[in-house]
Regions:
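C-terminal regulatory domains involved in ligand/effector binding and gene-expression control
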Residues: 11, 15, 19, 25-154, ...
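Intrinsically disordered, low-complexity regions enriched in Ser/Pro/Gly/Gln/His and often acidic
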Residues: 3-4, 13
Length: 271
């Protein structure tokens, strides 16, 4: 078992197959390139663990990324929730077995599985929260989801011992590191994707998104903040051939000092 830890940001990554010095591992990982446009589904080759502090709740959370069968999708499993007990008999989830195409087996009781889909998104204020029909939530999933998408991962079970994904260093880079340590495995199933056939525009307040037909995946972004600290206000990113890792994953969440008190009064930014 290998170990890599960064105490500067309070996060720890545990569980590589062989012990390597971080510098040696970094050189090896830099040679790995993933193409998000591949036609086959992918999962992780091995399970890998990490822990860190959650941004908004401030709690320390343990997380494990596990391989999953084709067509599973990205599913979060809240392992911190106790199953329902009736007359001394456990009638819930978590028995160490795996069923339903790689998902933890579930009997009756509270459903602790939360699939990461557009229709399970329940809140997007300051972070993205998903929620299942039983009311079980997982918050601040956006950096992990970006890393999974950017590295071409279609199927994974995310075991999370808490209500929120750890913030790590405020970017997607630690999650990319996790994925590369675990390795990728191609699956014998075609990737299912949404193809944009015509121009789509969405406006909401001062925000706007435009989707255009394309044979690949590229993103053009513009932001506007009343702050001299933000120099670059626009950018173009091509997500082919490792573009996410090269150009995007190290971008970190930022905030303004004037907003800290308000966020903490709302019970946010506790980490």
């Amino acid at each position: 078992t290998g170990l890599f830890a960064s105490t500067n940001f309070g996060w720890h990554i545990i569980g590589t197959d062989k012990l390597r010095r971080p510098r040696q591992l970094s050189r090896r990982l830099c040679r790995q390139v993933y193409d998000v446009n591949t036609k086959q589904q992918h999962t992780l080759k091995n399970a890998i663990n990490c822990s860190g502090v959650a941004l908004h709740s401030g709690v320390k959370v343990a997380m494990c990324l596990r391989p999953a069968a084709a067509d599973t999708g990205i599913v979060f499993h809240r392992t911190d929730l106790d199953p329902i007990v009736v007359d001394g008999v456990v009638d819930g989830v978590v028995d160490g077995t795996v069923d339903r195409g790689g998902l933890p087996a579930a009997r009756s009781g509270i459903d602790t599985l939360v699939p990461a889909r557009w229709d399970t998104v329940s809140d997007t204020v300051m972070s993205t929260t998903i929620c299942n029909d039983a009311g079980v939530k997982v918050a601040t999933i956006e950096h992990l989801m970006a890393a999974l998408a950017g590295c071409g991962i279609d199927n994974v079970v995310v075991e999370l011992a808490g209500p929120e994904v750890p913030i790590m260093d405020g970017s997607s880079a630690p999650f990319v590191f996790l994925i590369e340590c675990a390795g990728l495995e191609m699956q014998q199933a075609p990737r299912r994707s949404v193809r944009v056939l015509r121009r789509v525009e969405i406006d909401e307040g001062d925000r706007r998104a435009v989707l255009l037909p394309s044979d690949g995946f590229s993103v053009s972004l513009e932001i506007e903040f009343d702050s001299a600290a933000i120099v670059e206000k626009s950018g173009f990113f091509d997500l082919h051939n490792g573009g996410f890792k090269r150009d995007i994953c190290r971008a970190r969440t930022f905030g303004f000092e004037r907003e800290v008190s308000r966020l903490m009064d709302l019970g946010l930014a506790q980490g």
